[in-house]
């Protein structure tokens, strides 16, 4: 568990650290003070693109990740949306993709529990969420390491399956 005030402080520090700005996959980073979250727009990894072509027979355009805080679990919460490339009558467009087997597509079977949710404070939009139920066991919540909780959480819940390379 991470108290809300600590989460808020660490989120700002994480944003200021430029770790996402320097990430090769990251196209855009936006800190949303009103909604108390961090929005990332990512290019898909080669592996994710291959999985999508194989499993869904589609091309990806980008991935959206939204880091927010679960007041129910007192933990960080990762939300995800996948956007596919589509062409209708020769006009290119992007469309929200709702794969039937998201765990296989992301190659996170057995690592994380994902579910499809409607997020009220994000205009009622549909997102996949990485369920925060076992987060403190996965990340470790000893008091002496609390100052690095969010950074460790990001390395597990984001970089462990997407990888990290500086741009």
From Swiss-Prot:
A single GO BP: nucleophagy
Cleavable signal peptide: none
Keyword entries, A-Z: Autophagy, Membrane, Protein transport, Transferase, Transport, Ubl conjugation pathway
Subcellular location: Preautophagosomal structure membrane
GO molecular function annotations of the record: Atg12 transferase activity
Enzyme class: transferase
Active site: 133
Its membrane topology: Peripheral membrane protein
Gene Ontology cellular component annotations, sorted alphabetically: phagophore assembly site membrane
Enzyme Commission number(s) of this protein: 2.3.2.-
Domain of life: Eukaryota
Entries under InterPro entries matching the protein: Atg10 (IPR016524), Atg3/Atg10 (IPR007135)
Location (main, coarse): membrane
Subunit structure: Forms homooligomers. Interacts with ATG7 and ATG12.
Role, per record: E2-like enzyme required for the cytoplasm to vacuole transport (Cvt), autophagy and nucleophagy. Acts as an E2-like enzyme that catalyzes the conjugation of ATG12 to ATG5. ATG12 conjugation to ATG5 is required for proper localization of ATG8 to the preautophagosomal structure (PAS). Likely serves as an ATG5-recognition molecule.
Homology family: Belongs to the ATG10 family.
Protein name: Ubiquitin-like-conjugating enzyme ATG10
Organism the protein comes from: Saccharomyces cerevisiae (strain ATCC 204508 / S288c) (Baker's yeast)
Gene behind the chain: ATG10
């Amino acid at each position: 568990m991470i108290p809300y005030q600590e989460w808020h402080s660490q989120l700002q520090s994480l944003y200021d650290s430029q770790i996402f700005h320097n990430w090769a996959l990251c196209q855009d980073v936006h800190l949303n003070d009103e909604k108390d979250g961090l929005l990332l727009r990512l290019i898909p990894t080669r592996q994710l693109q291959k999985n999508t072509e194989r499993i869904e027979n589609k091309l990806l355009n980008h991935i959206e990740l939204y880091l927010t805080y679960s007041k129910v679990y007192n933990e960080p919460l990762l939300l995800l949306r996948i956007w596919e490339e589509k062409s209708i009558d020769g006009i290119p467009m992007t469309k929200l993709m709702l794969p039937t087997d998201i765990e296989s597509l992301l190659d996170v079977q057995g690592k994380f529990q994902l579910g499809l949710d409607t997020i009220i404070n994000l205009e009622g939009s549909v997102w996949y969420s990485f369920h925060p139920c076992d987060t403190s066991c996965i990340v470790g919540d000893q008091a002496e390491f609390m100052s690095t909780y969010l950074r460790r959480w990001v390395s597990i819940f984001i970089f462990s399956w997407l990888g990290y390379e500086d741009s």
